[in-house]
């Protein structure tokens, strides 16, 4: 009987593990935010009508995780530094920023890292990585009138022009071409499909504050991200050699179309030209987002990056604010840490187009598999467990039927 009781306990345990019954599930309170953290739930009020949907109501704010992703200290919305560290630079106007180690994922210092803001063009990293992961770089793409008609910064994509995915990526990342973003979105399946893929990538990278409404970063209904999420996205991107090479490129020959000749495209990131060891990054601006910026640099083998959201050009330009934050990070001892940029979902590893440069996956990353991906695994475990338990029960019954000597 003791053996049978053990088998019963084993059966219950296997069933619980296989189905997920009894395991805690993530929950959040989308409307619970301390008064001191005004952007914990929603982005700042818009200054124009660009986010008003054509019909219906705007989407509800994203659910706030019950605990801050990356560590409890990152739940603060003031300036957060490690104990004993020097004060952060005082000339950074961005309302949210972050300094982190590109290789270890250690967050060195931050301000309101999970505060929700609009990304502007720094969100183009997701279009770039979705394209790098799924498209062939030398694939030819015909420009369209819709590409040329997009609002904002453009690099010259138009009817009569043919561009490779690689050329579009350079136009996207070096000079923030919104026309290049829309051309790549067409290659990802068209606007609805592209946005679905981009948002899925953001989710698999751990971005719980991010909803992408446009591939270019132009403001749209429900557009949202955080300095922490942007840090996740760019850490992932910089481990890809195609991305790293493009954002570090200063000039590139971009093709023309029709009677319009090709020209030399210049990288618009001033950090690349003015900061020793700069690895590049991305600029951004819209009326609602304000100034946004991402930059990274290598100093004596230590690679750091910084993210700035909802900033201004005062008292110094965003790239100089980023430079001061990078200086601050490099002046802190290696190992200084207030939180962590979590590892991406393991499923991203199988779609990496550069297997020699794949990221490390820690044990915690395996726990972040999505519910949809986890369901077949749980069902399989439950079936196998049931067969094992059935076999053990049959063995136990056979033992009980044996004659006693």
From Swiss-Prot:
Inhibited by the beta-lactam antibiotic meropenem. GO terms for molecular function: serine-type D-Ala-D-Ala carboxypeptidase activity. Its main location: membrane. The lineage of its organism: Bacteria, Bacillati, Actinomycetota, Actinomycetes, Mycobacteriales. It is a single-pass membrane protein. It holds the Pfam family Peptidase_S11. Phosphorylated on Thr-336 by PknH. Probably cleaves the terminal D-Ala-D-Ala dipeptide of the peptidoglycan stem peptide. Shows weak D,D-carboxypeptidase activity in vitro. Acts on the synthetic penta-peptide substrate Penta-DAP (L-Ala-gamma-D-Gln-DAP-D-Ala-D-Ala). The catalytic domain binds weakly to peptidoglycan in vitro. The gene is dacB1. Keywords: Carboxypeptidase, Cell membrane, Cell shape, Cell wall biogenesis/degradation, Hydrolase, Membrane, Peptidoglycan synthesis, Phosphoprotein, Protease, Signal, Transmembrane, Transmembrane helix. Belongs to the peptidase S11 family. This is D-alanyl-D-alanine carboxypeptidase DacB1. PANTHER family: D-ALANYL-D-ALANINE CARBOXYPEPTIDASE (PTHR21581), D-ALANYL-D-ALANINE CARBOXYPEPTIDASE DACB (PTHR21581:SF33). GO terms for cellular component: plasma membrane. It is an enzyme of class 3 (hydrolase). GO terms for biological process: cell wall organization; peptidoglycan biosynthetic process; proteolysis; regulation of cell shape. The chain crosses the membrane at residues 375-395. Pathway: Cell wall biogenesis; peptidoglycan biosynthesis. It comes from the Bacteria. It comes from Mycobacterium tuberculosis (strain ATCC 25618 / H37Rv). The active site is at residues 121, 124, 176. The modification Phosphothreonine is found at residue 336. The keyword Transmembrane applies. Residues 1-32 form the signal peptide. Its EC number is 3.4.16.-. It is found in: Cell membrane. InterPro entries: Beta-lactam/transpept-like, Peptidase_S11, Peptidase_S11_N.
């Amino acid at each position: 009987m003791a053996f049978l009781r053990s088998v019963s306990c084993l059966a219950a345990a296997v069933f619980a593990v296989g189905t997920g019954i009894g395991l805690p599930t993530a929950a959040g309170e989308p409307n619970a935010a301390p008064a001191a953290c005004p952007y914990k739930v929603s982005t700042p009020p818009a200054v124009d009508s660009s986010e008003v949907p054509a019909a219906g109501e705007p989407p509800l704010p994203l659910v706030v995780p019950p605990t801050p992703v990356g560590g409890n200290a990152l739940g603060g919305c003031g300036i957060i530094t490690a104990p004993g560290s020097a004060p952060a630079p005082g000339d950074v106007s961005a309302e949210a920023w972050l300094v982190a180690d590109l290789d270890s994922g250690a967050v060195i210092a931050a301000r309101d890292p999970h505060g929700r803001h609009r990304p502007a063009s720094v969100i183009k990293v997701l279009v770039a990585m979705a394209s790098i992961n799924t498209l062939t770089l030398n694939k030819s793409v015909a420009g369209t009138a819709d590409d040329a008609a997009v609002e904002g910064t453009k690099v010259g994509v138009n009817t009569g022009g043919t561009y490779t995915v690689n050329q579009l990526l350079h136009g996207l990342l070096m000079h923030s071409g919104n026309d290049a973003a829309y051309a790549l979105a067409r290659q990802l399946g068209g606007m609805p499909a592209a946005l679905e893929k981009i948002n899925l990538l953001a989710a698999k990278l751990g971005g719980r504050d991010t909803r992408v409404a446009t591939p270019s970063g132009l403001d749209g209904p429900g557009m949202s991200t955080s300095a922490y999420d942007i840090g996740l996205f760019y850490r992932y991107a910089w481990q890809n050699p195609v991305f790293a090479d493009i954002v570090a490129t200063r000039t590139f020959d971009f093709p023309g179309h029709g009677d319009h000749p090709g020209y030399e495209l210049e990288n618009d990131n001033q950090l690349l030209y003015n900061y020793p060891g700069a690895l590049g990054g991305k600029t951004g601006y819209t009326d609602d987002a304000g100034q946004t910026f991402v930059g990274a640099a290598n100093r004596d083998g230590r690679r750091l990056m910084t993210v700035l959201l909802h900033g201004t050009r005062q008292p110094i330009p965003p790239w100089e604010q980023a430079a001061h934050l990078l200086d601050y990070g490099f002046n802190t001892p290696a190992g200084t840490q207030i939180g962590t940029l979590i590892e991406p979902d393991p499923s991203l590893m199988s779609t990496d187009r550069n297997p020699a440069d794949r990221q490390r996956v820690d044990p915690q990353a395996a726990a972040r598999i999505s519910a949809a991906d986890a369901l077949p695994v749980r069902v399989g475990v439950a079936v196998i467990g049931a067969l094992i338990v059935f076999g053990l029960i049959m063995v136990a019954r056979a033992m009980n039927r044996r004659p006693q000597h």
